[in-house]
């Protein structure tokens, strides 16, 4: 009996694109390439150089399983297990928020302010995947970091990301709760900079989010369960105790509440300002602490 011909790389790629596009998935071609690449252990160039190559049966089955996950709404980054932020690779899973391009603007602002400080002491509150701390450490090799989060699972992933990017020795990972009395004792004082990407989505806005966000990313990293400003109110309580005179505090916020976040932060950082992301939306608030 003649052997039944299997599906080729090119045929599988076309099928994946068609199903993803038909389901309304954005960037269907990119999604298809990454899913096929993971299933067949091929990078993008290898896919296009081997379009006539026959896929092994187990590779085709794996591609189908990955496709089903994506069609249900699971973020591509979780399916792949990796993403990129500020030009660096990161492992991600459902224990951490997927790093966003707009947060790179917060990193750029931080580096801009630290130009004349080669060895700053920096606190990253709610580090998650470690995206901000790792990116800053990669550009400030003499800096010292405390990366703080209430999730031990997230901190383990962040530590893995710091090792992958060769900055593990610069970062101390601390588990705890920003809202507990022992928070300051657990992280220390005299920081040159505090950076934070807090949960800033209001509880009432959660239902309007995309499925791949609200059903897959950690809820505690998205919303404070209230008006999206709870963390800002807590930050102004601790910033004066944590920051040395002349130190900075930079926080990401929702564009819809930028002015409200600014008003809160100005209670302890009178010169605080709003910065916009690349789309021109007011997404960051920051200022210098002066006793």
Feature map (PLM): residue ranges:
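Mobile active-site "lid"/loop adjacent to the S-adenosyl-L-methionine
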Residues: 200-231
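Non-catalytic accessory regions of SAM-dependent methyltransferases
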Residues: 1-40, 46-48, 52-53
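Conserved SAM/SAH cofactor-binding pocket of Class I
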Residues: 101-208
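Conserved AdoMet
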Residues: 36-112
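Helix-to-beta-strand junctions that scaffold the AdoMet/dcAdoMet cofactor pocket
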Residues: 167, 217, 243-245
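Residue-level signal for inorganic ion chemistry
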Residues: 35, 73, 103, 132, ...
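Conserved Class I SAM-dependent methyltransferase catalytic core
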Residues: 226-288
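Conserved hydrophobic residues forming the short capping helix/wall of the S-adenosyl-L-methionine
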Residues: 20, 114, 162, 239, ...
């Amino acid at each position: 009996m003649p052997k039944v011909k299997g599906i080729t790389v090119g045929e599988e790629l076309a099928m994946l694109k068609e199903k993803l596009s038909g389901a309304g998935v954005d960037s269907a071609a990119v999604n298809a390439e990454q899913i096929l690449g993971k299933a067949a252990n091929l990078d993008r160039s290898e896919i296009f150089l081997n379009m006539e190559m026959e896929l092994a049966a187990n590779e085709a089955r794996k591609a189908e399983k990955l496709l089903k996950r994506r069609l249900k709404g699971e973020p591509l980054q979780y399916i792949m297990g990796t993403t990129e932020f500020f030009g660096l690779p990161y492992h991600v899973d459902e224990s951490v928020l997927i790093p966003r391009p707009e947060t790179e603007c917060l990193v750029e602002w931080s580096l801009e302010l630290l130009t004349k400080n080669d060895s700053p002491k920096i606190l990253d509150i709610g580090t998650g995947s470690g995206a901000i701390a790792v990116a800053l450490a990669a550009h400030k090799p003499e800096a010292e970091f405390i990366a703080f989060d209430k999730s031990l699972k997230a901190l383990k992933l962040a530590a893995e990301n710091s090792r992958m990017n060769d900055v593990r020795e610069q970062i101390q990972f601390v588990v705890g709760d920003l809202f507990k009395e022992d928070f300051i004792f657990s992280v220390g004082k005299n920081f040159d900079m505090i950076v934070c990407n807090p949960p800033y989505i209001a509880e009432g806005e959660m239902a309007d989010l995309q499925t791949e966000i609200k059903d897959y990313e950690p809820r505690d990293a998205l919303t404070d369960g209230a008006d999206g400003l709870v963390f800002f109110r807590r930050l102004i309580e601790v910033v004066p105790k944590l920051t040395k005179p002349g130190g900075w505090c930079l926080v990401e916020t929702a564009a819809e509440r930028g002015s409200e976040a600014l008003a809160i932060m100005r209670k302890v950082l009178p010169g605080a300002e709003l910065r916009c992301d690349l789309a021109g939306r007011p997404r960051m608030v920051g200022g210098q602490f002066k006793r």
